[in-house]
Amino acid sequence: GFLSAEEKGLVNGLWSKVNVDEVGGEALGRLLVVYPWTQRFFQSFGDLSSADAIMSNAKVKAHGKKVLNSFSDGLKNIDDLKGAFAKLSELHCDKLHVDPENFRLLGNVLVCVLAHHFGHEFNPQVQAAFQKVVAGVASALAHRYH
């Protein structure tokens, strides 16, 4: 696997304390605020006219929750991310034509949100392990492009 046993321990230890539903909504919301061009995939979501509108948008929260629950499931199959995300890769790449760069952006936003929520606990070692994970997930989701 691409993570050492120690790194897996750090990731799982922190992840067990994450409120997946809440963090998912915040991460997706921040993605849409910070990288506004990603909003074009969410035109059916209603009001995305301001940061406040986006962060309180129920559809954004619901999809963010869905996204992070999938990420959570993926963590259980950390040594086979390609397999874990094959169906989602197909959906996002072949059907929705999402630029794989967006998966990387969301991963980086997720790292920011975790740092914000966990403060000192999200130390450099934990961040390094999570950066590997989000890069691995982004790469698995982009798999259909290669």
From Swiss-Prot:
Keywords: Heme, Iron, Metal-binding, Methylation, Oxygen transport, Phosphoprotein, Transport. Heme b binds at H63, H92. SUPFAM superfamilies: Globin-like. One of its GO terms (molecular function) is organic acid binding. GO terms for cellular component: blood microparticle; haptoglobin-hemoglobin complex; hemoglobin complex. One of its GO terms (biological process) is hydrogen peroxide catabolic process. It comes from the Eukaryota. Residues 2-146 form the Globin domain. The modification Asymmetric dimethylarginine is found at R104. Coiled coil: none annotated. Heterotetramer of two alpha chains and two beta chains. Involved in oxygen transport from the lung to the various peripheral tissues. This is Hemoglobin subunit beta-2. It comes from Panthera pardus saxicolor (Northern Persian leopard).
